[in-house]
């Protein structure tokens, strides 16, 4: 243990503790910009500079460890002035048109600039004349980047993709796509973790709010919107509402207020996904010799992009079931169009998703109907719909609750937990057990697949089918480890759930940003609690899904179901060629 003094307060901490963490342990806050604990501790921004007695130079607190007897001053006049100088230097190479930035009001640089009262003009502006690329779901804006390296470290250490890298040397050094190429030419999964960990507006999702506003204003369009499970756990964070109050039904009211004609729940097609994917698993499991193993879930588009580029030998192991988002669009433009007696081309389908990769998924050539129209017309992230609410002056705190529209508005507890890591596996096993035995298991029988561990495994016995070995992973880093272990023959599973983002969709790349705070666990808890308190907790008991099969699809894995609800993962290619 080491004892030191910080701002006159004695503190004892373990050896190798940084000055920053030692200060935080006694509630002394040192400002940071580039720092991410355990991921980016490189002192790049120098905002966390502190003064250590006996040392001639100021030192960054994030990457300097404590020593016995050290005396630290975190807010001396010398320190404050150094921080102001560093902020001015950052601002000289930063596009300060804050009113045009989606991160305005939620930007670490903007906050620090205000905190240090940096008003008026600063150093001479030195912006780069590089055109920005708006052709992908993830957008990088050169003159908003502060070169903090967070995106590089997240992509490398957490997601193991290495998409971002430092480019150039000296003062022109910047961040760009590695090996140089455009983002669209890379094997980026568009998971969006670089976006949610950017402290400023240097990285953001492609903004599609204008398309939705145009559709809402078009009297010839019938606007249909779906809300993903994980969105209900995060949509009202900007408005500081308690999750218990910020219900999905209040969001329905907000969407109706905006002018959407029909508001449905993606939970409906999450249940439908379980019926198709669960039936597919049973078919494969009971005819093992006909298939490759293990079977992988396919509802996460970031994961699908990952396996196609990194482990193409396993593309055939993916479930052919479309994601709930895409199933919804397909059902709306067929079954619902028939129910409403309207031309499917009049239907404009909007998805509200916790995910940036969903934008890429909706644009795939394999996600179109026989007429060539997309299943889903526009995908909005949670952040985008919040901006739309703000623009429409909608205050969720004063809204009443409105039920989802019928017939695509009912979802079970099993569907809700699609938004948390382990939820798809849990839901699938609940219904697979029933489809084999004709009896429901305890809805919490498969709790071993829940929780925030990045790689979980379990074995369950389904009477009449045998032992089922399963695994659940979240984050592409954990996924790479699992895939390497499978390829090496070190592990053997029957069914694997993969989510590209740590913690699953609850921590998705399209969710609200809380700088340096990971929200996936608490949002996941919200979803598991909804499941626990829902009367119907099995996807196969969704009466609207049952009616859809009876009236239209006939049966899981049937001809019409295969046409509408399944896809060919070999029908499109990643830039790497697979």
Regions found by a protein language model. Give the residues of each.
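Short strand-turn-strand beta-turns centered on an Asx-Gly dipeptide
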Residues: 6-9, 53-54
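Residue-level recognition of alpha-helix initiation/capping sites
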Residues: 14, 136, 146, 189, ...
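Iron-sulfur-associated redox domains of electron-transfer enzymes in respiratory
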Residues: 15-75, 79, 205-578
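Fe-S ferredoxin-like electron-transfer domains
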Residues: 46-190, 196, 203-222
């Amino acid at each position: 243990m080491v004892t030191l003094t910080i701002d006159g307060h004695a503190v004892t901490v373990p050896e190798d503790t940084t000055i920053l963490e030692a200060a935080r342990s006694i509630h002394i806050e040192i400002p940071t910009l580039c720092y991410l604990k355990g991921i980016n501790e490189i002192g790049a921004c120098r905002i966390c500079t502190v003064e250590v007695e006996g040392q001639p130079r100021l030192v960054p607190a994030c990457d300097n460890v404590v020593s016995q007897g050290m005396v630290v001053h975190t807010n001396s006049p010398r320190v404050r002035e150094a921080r102001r100088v560093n902020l001015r230097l950052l601002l000289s190479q930063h596009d300060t048109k804050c009113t045009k930035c989606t991160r305005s009001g939620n930007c670490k640089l903007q906050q620090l600039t205000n905190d240090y009262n940096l008003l008026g003009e600063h150093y001479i502006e030195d912006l780069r004349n590089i055109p920005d690329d708006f052709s992908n779901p993830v957008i990088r804006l050169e003159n908003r980047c502060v070169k903090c390296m967070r995106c590089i470290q997240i992509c490398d250490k957490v997601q193991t993709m290495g998409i971002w890298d430092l480019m150039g040397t000296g003062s022109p050094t910047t961040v760009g796509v590695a090996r140089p190429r455009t983002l669209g030419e890379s094997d980026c999964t568009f998971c969006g973790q670089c976006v949610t960990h950017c402290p400023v507006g240097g990285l953001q999702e492609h903004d599609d709010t204008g398309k939705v506003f145009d559709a809402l204003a078009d009297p010839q369009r019938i606007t249909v919107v779906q809300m993903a499970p994980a969105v209900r756990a995060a949509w009202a964070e900007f408005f500081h509402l308690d999750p218990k109050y910020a219900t999905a039904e209040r969001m329905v009211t907000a969407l109706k207020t905006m002018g959407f004609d029909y508001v449905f729940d993606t939970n409906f097609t999450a249940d439908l996904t379980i019926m198709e994917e669960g039936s597919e698993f049973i078919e494969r499991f009971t005819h093992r010799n006909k298939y490759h193993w293990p079977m992988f879930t396919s509802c996460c588009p970031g994961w699908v992009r990952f396996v196609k580029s990194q482990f193409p030998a396993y593309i055939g192991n993916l479930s052919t079931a479309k994601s709930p988002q895409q199933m919804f669009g397909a059902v709306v433009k067929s079954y619902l169009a028939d129910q409403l007696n309207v031309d499917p081309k009049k239907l404009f389908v909007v998805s509200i998703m916790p995910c940036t990769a969903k934008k890429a998924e909706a644009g795939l050539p394999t996600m179109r109907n026989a007429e060539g129209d997309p299943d889903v017309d526009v995908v909005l992230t949670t952040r985008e719909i919040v901006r739309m609410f703000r623009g429409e002056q909608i205050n969720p705190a004063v809204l009443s609750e409105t039920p989802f529209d019928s017939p695509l508005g009912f979802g079970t507890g099993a569907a809700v937990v699609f938004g948390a890591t382990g939820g798809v596996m849990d839901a699938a096993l609940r219904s697979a057990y029933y489809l084999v035995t004709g009896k429901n298991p305890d809805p919490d029988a498969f709790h071993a697949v829940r929780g925030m561990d990045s790689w979980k495994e379990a074995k369950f016995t389904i009477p009449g089918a045998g032992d089922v070995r399963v695994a659940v992973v979240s984050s592409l880093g954990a996924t790479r480890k699992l895939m390497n272990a499978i390829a090496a023959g070190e592990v053997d599973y029957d069914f694997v759930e993969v989510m590209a983002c740590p913690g699953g969709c609850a921590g998705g790349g399209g969710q609200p940003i809380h700088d340096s705070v990971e929200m996936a666990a608490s949002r996941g808890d919200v979803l598991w609690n909804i499941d626990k308190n829902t009367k119907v907790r099995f996807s196969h008991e969704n009466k609207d899904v049952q009616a859809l099969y009876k009236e239209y699809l006939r049966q899981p894995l049937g001809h019409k179901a295969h046409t509408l609800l399944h896809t060919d993962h070999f029908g499109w290619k990643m830039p790497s060629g697979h």
